Amino acid sequence: MRTTLTHLQQLEAESIHIIREVVAEFANPVMLYSIGKDSAVMLHLARKAFYPAPPPFPLLHVDTTWKFRDMIQFRDRMAAECGFDLIVHVNKEGVEQGISPFTHGSALYTDIMKTEGLKQALDKYRFDAAFGGARRDEEKSRAKERIFSFRSANHRWDPKNQRPELWNLYNTRIKQGESIRVFPLSNWTELDVWQYIHLENIPIVPLYYAAVRPVVERDGMLIMVDDERLELKPGETVQHKSVRFRTLGCYPLTGAVESTADTLPKIIQEMLLTRTSERQGRLIDHDQAGSMEKKKQEGYF
């Protein structure tokens, strides 16, 4: 008897197939773990793909030292509870130079602490394939990127030189020094992610749920005061508002949204009504025209 899969089951099956394909074709894969909701779903899929064995690859977190404290606590707790092999990499040169989003601006900070940090880790451990949680509905440059995204020996992405992907057939051939970035969630939407998290009861960082938090209004965004390093500008005052985050990154560059959605059903209901992209809350996407595509060409995920 033929079984009809639901929409989420089809997405799950596709993602698991992609994850298994990478393990079968590459010598040294790694999964990027940014601690966000997409990473949570991707890790859950990887655990399903190889159960009862653990995923046969490590997780890599590029720590900029400016992540929300709740994110780091959640990362360490998940690593301890799940027992996965976690690599944490920090660009020490950037730390020694005192690079920060406040003094150097979002573009330079992102390039040094995120892009260069990622490239350092990929080179150090000689990973030839790296999973990422990017989705095509997030942003226009990601919308046109392949699921198996080729990178040169310098980790650069050329959007004009992408490989055809017919049905579920993927070209995994690379030369020495080259690599592939793989996006198992490419065809998922933000709503799909939230529905799957609810269905599978996947743990996520508490910042995704609405709560009263200290924020300042800066450049049209609500920036959470996460630690003492956030200095108030003239005229700014700390306000306590019920907010949550649709996307998580470095706290000085991530805007919150006013919300009362403190449960998964409420978040899903909110998603059904929203008409804006979650990436609007990320300052690094707006620091110059075509910002994300330029970052990806330079090696950003």
Curated annotation (Swiss-Prot):
Gene Ontology MF terms in the entry: ATP binding; sulfate adenylyltransferase (ATP) activity
Gene Ontology BP term (one): sulfate assimilation
EC number annotated for this UniProt entry: 2.7.7.4
Keywords of this entry: ATP-binding, Nucleotide-binding, Nucleotidyltransferase, Transferase
Domain of life: Bacteria
Paired cysteines (S-S): none
Keyword set includes Transferase: yes
One Pfam family linked to the record: PAPS_reduct
InterPro entries membership: PAPS_reduct_dom, Rossmann-like_a/b/a_fold, SO4_adenylTrfase_ssu, Sulfate_adenylyltrnsfr_sub2
Biochemical pathway: Sulfur metabolism; hydrogen sulfide biosynthesis; sulfite from sulfate: step 1/3
Entries under SUPFAM superfamilies matching the protein: Adenine nucleotide alpha hydrolases-like
Catalytic activity: sulfate + ATP + H(+) = adenosine 5'-phosphosulfate + diphosphate
Function: With CysN forms the ATP sulfurylase (ATPS) that catalyzes the adenylation of sulfate producing adenosine 5'-phosphosulfate (APS) and diphosphate, the first enzymatic step in sulfur assimilation pathway. APS synthesis involves the formation of a high-energy phosphoric-sulfuric acid anhydride bond driven by GTP hydrolysis by CysN coupled to ATP hydrolysis by CysD.
Quaternary assembly: Heterodimer composed of CysD, the smaller subunit, and CysN.
Family designation: Belongs to the PAPS reductase family. CysD subfamily.
Name of the protein in its database record: Sulfate adenylyltransferase subunit 2
UniProt organism field: Geobacter metallireducens (strain ATCC 53774 / DSM 7210 / GS-15)
Gene that encodes it: cysD
